[in-house]
């Protein structure tokens, strides 16, 4: 019996796959529990259309992320922080600070996507990675200056 899995099933397959299972397993376990649907022509066609729509959406998100990465790479942020002698900061610069500076420039980026390569505890120039999409990262220059 051919079925289309609705959810991931251990030792059978992942959601969206068309798999061949024994008639009893399909009819008595997978179908009643809503883990799969029968692989009729209409269901297979609907699955293929859904996959195409998801792929198109994924491509669009990737293009938008690449455009955003290009804009962010040309950006330079200046953060004014309280600092003591020798440029040592009282505290450190966090992803929240960078998020707020980006919001001021018109970019709405979640702080979870901002990754520091090193701890920012002194004044100077740093580069921060912003993960926009799987495989798309932008480097933003951050100048930390004393108030």
From Swiss-Prot:
<dbReference type="GO" id="GO:1990904">
    <property type="term" value="C:ribonucleoprotein complex"/>
</dbReference>
<protein>
    <recommendedName>
        <fullName>Large ribosomal subunit protein bL9</fullName>
    </recommendedName>
</protein>
<keyword id="KW-0694">RNA-binding</keyword>
<keyword id="KW-0689">Ribosomal protein</keyword>
<dbReference type="InterPro" id="IPR036935">
    <property type="entry name" value="Ribosomal_bL9_N_sf"/>
</dbReference>
<dbReference type="GO" id="GO:0003735">
    <property type="term" value="F:structural constituent of ribosome"/>
</dbReference>
<dbReference type="Pfam" id="PF03948">
    <property type="entry name" value="Ribosomal_L9_C"/>
</dbReference>
<dbReference type="InterPro" id="IPR036791">
    <property type="entry name" value="Ribosomal_bL9_C_sf"/>
</dbReference>
<dbReference type="GO" id="GO:0005840">
    <property type="term" value="C:ribosome"/>
</dbReference>
<dbReference type="InterPro" id="IPR020070">
    <property type="entry name" value="Ribosomal_bL9_N"/>
</dbReference>
<dbReference type="InterPro" id="IPR020594">
    <property type="entry name" value="Ribosomal_bL9_bac/chp"/>
</dbReference>
<dbReference type="InterPro" id="IPR020069">
    <property type="entry name" value="Ribosomal_bL9_C"/>
</dbReference>
<dbReference type="GO" id="GO:0006412">
    <property type="term" value="P:translation"/>
</dbReference>
<comment type="function">
    <text>Binds to the 23S rRNA.</text>
</comment>
<keyword id="KW-0699">rRNA-binding</keyword>
<dbReference type="InterPro" id="IPR000244">
    <property type="entry name" value="Ribosomal_bL9"/>
</dbReference>
<dbReference type="InterPro" id="IPR009027">
    <property type="entry name" value="Ribosomal_bL9/RNase_H1_N"/>
</dbReference>
<keyword id="KW-0687">Ribonucleoprotein</keyword>
<dbReference type="GO" id="GO:0019843">
    <property type="term" value="F:rRNA binding"/>
</dbReference>
<comment type="similarity">
    <text>Belongs to the bacterial ribosomal protein bL9 family.</text>
</comment>
<dbReference type="Pfam" id="PF01281">
    <property type="entry name" value="Ribosomal_L9_N"/>
</dbReference>
């Amino acid at each position: 019996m051919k079925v289309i899995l609705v959810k991931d099933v251990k030792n059978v397959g992942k959601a969206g796959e068309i798999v061949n299972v024994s008639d009893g397993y399909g009819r008595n376990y997978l179908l009643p529990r809503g883990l799969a649907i029968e692989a009729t022509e209409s269901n297979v066609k609907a699955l293929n259309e859904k996959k195409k729509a998801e792929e198109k959406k994924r491509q669009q998100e990737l293009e938008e992320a690449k455009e955003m990465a290009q804009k962010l790479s040309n950006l330079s942020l200046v953060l004014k922080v309280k600092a003591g002698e020798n440029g040592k900061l009282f505290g450190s610069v966090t992803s929240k600070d960078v998020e707020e500076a980006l919001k001021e420039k018109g970019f709405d980026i979640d702080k979870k996507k901002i990754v520091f390569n090193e701890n920012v505890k002194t004044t100077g120039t740093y580069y921060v990675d912003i993960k926009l999409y799987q495989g798309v990262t932008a480097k933003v220059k951050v100048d930390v200056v004393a108030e």
